[in-house]
Amino acid sequence: YTFNKDGSVFVEPLMMEPEKLELMEQNLMMFYTGTMHSASEILAEQGQNLKNSKTKEENQLKMCSLAKELRGYLQGGKVDLLGEILHENWMLKRTLASGISNPEIDEYYESAMKAGALGGKLLGAGGGGFLLFYVPENRQGQVRDKLRLPEIPLQFDKQGSALIYVGIKPHTVRKERERTEIS
């Protein structure tokens, strides 16, 4: 993806050999940390920090540069470099706002790395949720055993993102909650 200054997004497919794409998919592991976070608070702090700190702005630019670098590696078949770049990116992302990581997340991350992960990151704004790791297949059992977190099966979708209809409108849930609190 390329995010343009006018708010538009340019999507360009990542062209990879099918066997390399399959290897990448096999080596990605996702775990649910069980922790919740406020994405809006983290993103608000991050936005302020980027305005007020040249270092944080440089770190974000480096993250963008790493993504472009990774694209070239993946298209060239160097799939295992994904782990290294995920790691470097995560180290940079942690500097952008105080709530992006916490001691519990740091402990999970360090444990996975010691058990054989080549790199990883917390998905989303930070603070909790899902950890994604790039782990060679022969080390996945050790990572799984060390983390003891619910593992979420991961499979690439070649169709792109899609909206899933749940059947409950957010405002309906809010109104039900308000009725319960009033009673």
For the regions a language model picked out, list residue spans one by one.
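Glycine-rich active-site/cofactor-binding loop and its immediate structural neighborhood
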Residues: 128
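C-terminal nucleotide
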Residues: 1-120, 132-183
